[in-house]
């Protein structure tokens, strides 16, 4: 999927097939890559989750991660919040429709969605067993800003805090990209804040990639449910 670009109204602009493939992209926060939670529109026109914006405002001279203009506290995006409350999407498991504001709580308890996740993990494992050389490295990661590499998750977080605290370039998260559920082409508008919010823990704490297939699937499933 191509990197998202947002207009002054905060809606993601995707052209052609990309727009059709990601019709809900305009409801996605460019920092945490989740559906907006308490969306706030800042003076430059872009929108962030309230909690994500607070993190982005912490530097002495904060900038918008999308357009790099000076960042300041914003106002509640009431219209966008209304759209999140009224826009429907379907559960990949049971295929029932739910409002965006309700889908997370639904999938956490939907047994068919859990089966959908298991089938996806099973397919990933099967493909990896057929092409072992293409299995992504989930233990060490390169810095997306510079040539440094071989960081564990915690090391990558610390490296970016120390050496890239002012770099606002949109980059692909190497941790997300290595996971079965990750999108290797999705660029986070503020990668440093993204990894601090989304990767405070190591996946190895929850998933042992050396255990048998069934145990691994169950561990990944539990992690995905918790993250919803």
UniProtKB/Swiss-Prot annotation:
Q: Where in the cell is it found?
A: Cytoplasm; Nucleus
- Cite the InterPro entries for this sequence: Di19_Zn-bd, RNF114_RING-HC, RNF_E3_ubiq-protein_ligase, ZF_C2HC_RNF, Znf-RING_euk, Znf_RING, Znf_RING/FYVE/PHD, Znf_RING_CS
Report what the Swiss-Prot or TrEMBL entry states about this protein's PTMs.
Autoubiquitinated. Polyubiquitinated in the presence of E2 enzymes UBE2D1, UBE2D2 and UBE2D3, but only monoubiquitinated in the presence of UBE2E1.
Keyword Protein biosynthesis in annotation = no
Enumerate the Gene Ontology biological process terms. Answer: cell differentiation; protein polyubiquitination; spermatogenesis; ubiquitin-dependent protein catabolic process
**Chain positions recorded as Zn(2+) binding sites:** 91, 94, 106, 110
Entry keyword Thylakoid: no
User: Which pathway does the database say it acts in?
Assistant: Protein modification; protein ubiquitination
| GO terms for MF | ubiquitin protein ligase activity; zinc ion binding
C2HC RNF-type zinc finger span: 91-110
Q: Where are the zinc fingers (RING-type)?
A: 29-68
Listed as disulfide-bonded, the cysteine pairs are none
Q: Which residues carry this modification: N6-acetyllysine?
A: 102, 112
Q: What is its EC number?
A: 2.3.2.27
- Record key words, sorted: Acetylation, Cytoplasm, Developmental protein, Differentiation, Metal-binding, Nucleus, Spermatogenesis, Transferase, Ubl conjugation, Ubl conjugation pathway, Zinc, Zinc-finger
- Cite the record's tissue specificity text: Expressed in numerous tissues, including skin, CD4 lymphocytes and dendritic cells. Highest levels in testis.
> What coarse category fits the chief subcellular location reported for this protein?
cytoplasm
Provide a GO CC annotation, any one.
cytosol
Functional description taken from the UniProt entry: E3 ubiquitin-protein ligase that promotes the ubiquitination of various substrates. In turn, participates in the regulation of many biological processes including cell cycle, apoptosis, osteoclastogenesis as well as innate or adaptive immunity. Acts as a negative regulator of NF-kappa-B-dependent transcription by promoting the ubiquitination and stabilization of the NF-kappa-B inhibitor TNFAIP3. May promote the ubiquitination of TRAF6 as well. Also acts as a negative regulator of T-cell activation.
On subunit structure and binding partners, the annotation says: Interacts with XAF1, the interaction increases XAF1 stability and proapoptotic effects, and may regulate IFN signaling.
The name on file for this protein is E3 ubiquitin-protein ligase RNF114
Organism name: Homo sapiens (Human)
